């Protein structure tokens, strides 16, 4: 049995296949297993909370895990070690989520590939190798254009009294949140990035409001400036996007691309299905 796992910051999608890779046997989820966010010694425990995975833990022979926070070798080793505790008989490959995005959006030609979900990232994928210009610095210093960045922007504008009255009243009614509660959640609780990203729901439900359209537009501009324009060939190749934020705000995303005279290619909401197809075509053949 083979497992292919797409691990975002908030959740991991698991797909289990027959050993020949042709038939899907199970689809399930765990929480996100980002080693920069979750305590390392809790990774195995979180996997073990899924009864479907525990039931087949001795039957898995290969696990292809692609995870947020797995861009550094040290983090790859940590995640691999924790997964191995749960699946002792499996041969495990751990790669960063950007690799999964590149595979999921691959159309047979070189392209810039971007993640816009809870967090954000980018690379150039030539069909064989990922080429990165810049690191991903996480929600504290980076993640421009992401769900956490959009959530942070709308929360900040609410507390700093920048939101128009209609939006401020709706935000107040929806969350009844004090500054003290916000600070506690962000600075003294785990998964602050996911907490900030949860406010994106407020924006997405009102994305046609002019103020929020501009808020998202500015966040997307920041993403392009930090994560796309540094690639010298960004004007000559397609730019593919993976993740819920790129899907929800695709009209605004395309407007920003047009502003910079760039060409948007594929937009993939959930990469797991395309990731499985990529493995079946190129890796498990």
Regions found by a protein language model. Give the residues of each.
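Polybasic, low-complexity association/targeting segments
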Residues: 64-71
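A short glycine/serine-rich beta->alpha loop
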Residues: 35, 69, 136-143, 262-266
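ATP-binding/phosphotransfer module of carbohydrate and carboxylate kinases, centering on a glycine-rich
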Residues: 1-63, 82, 105-112, 155-285
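Phosphate-binding/catalytic loop of phosphoryl-transfer enzymes
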Residues: 71-166
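Anionic group-transfer/hydrolysis microenvironments
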Residues: 8, 15, 68, 99, ...
């Amino acid at each position: 049995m083979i497992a292919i796992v797409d691990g975002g910051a908030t959740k991991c999608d698991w797909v289990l296949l027959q050993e020949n890779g042709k038939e899907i046997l199970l689809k399930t989820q765990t929480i996100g297993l980002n080693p920069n966010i979750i305590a390392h010694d809790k990774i195995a425990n979180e996997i073990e909370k899924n009864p479907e995975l525990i039931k087949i833990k001795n039957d898995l022979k290969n696990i292809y895990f692609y995870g947020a926070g797995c861009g550094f070798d040290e983090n790859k080793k940590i995640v691999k070690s924790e997964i191995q505790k749960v699946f002792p008989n499996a041969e495990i490959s751990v790669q960063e989520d950007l690799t999964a995005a590149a595979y999921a959006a691959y159309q047979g030609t070189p392209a810039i590939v971007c993640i816009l979900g809870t967090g954000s990232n980018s690379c150039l994928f030539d069909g064989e190798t990922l080429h990165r210009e810049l690191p991903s610095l996480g929600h504290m210093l980076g993640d421009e254009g992401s769900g956490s960045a959009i959530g942070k922007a709308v929360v900040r504008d609410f507390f700093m009294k920048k939101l128009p009255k209609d939006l401020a009243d709706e935000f107040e009614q929806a969350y009844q949140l004090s500054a003290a509660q916000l600070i506690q959640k962000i600075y003294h609780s785990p998964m602050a990035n996911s907490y900030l990203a949860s406010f994106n729901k407020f924006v997405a439900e009102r994305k046609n409001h002019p103020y929020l359209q501009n808020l998202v537009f500015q966040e997307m501009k920041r993403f392009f400036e930090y994560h796309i324009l540094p690639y010298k060939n960004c004007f000559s190749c397609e730019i593919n996007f993976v993740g819920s934020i790129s899907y929800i705000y695709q009209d605004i995303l395309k407007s920003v691309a047009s502003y910079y005279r760039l060409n948007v290619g594929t937009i993939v909401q959930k990469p797991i299905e395309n990731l499985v197809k990529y493995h079946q075509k190129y890796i498990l053949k």
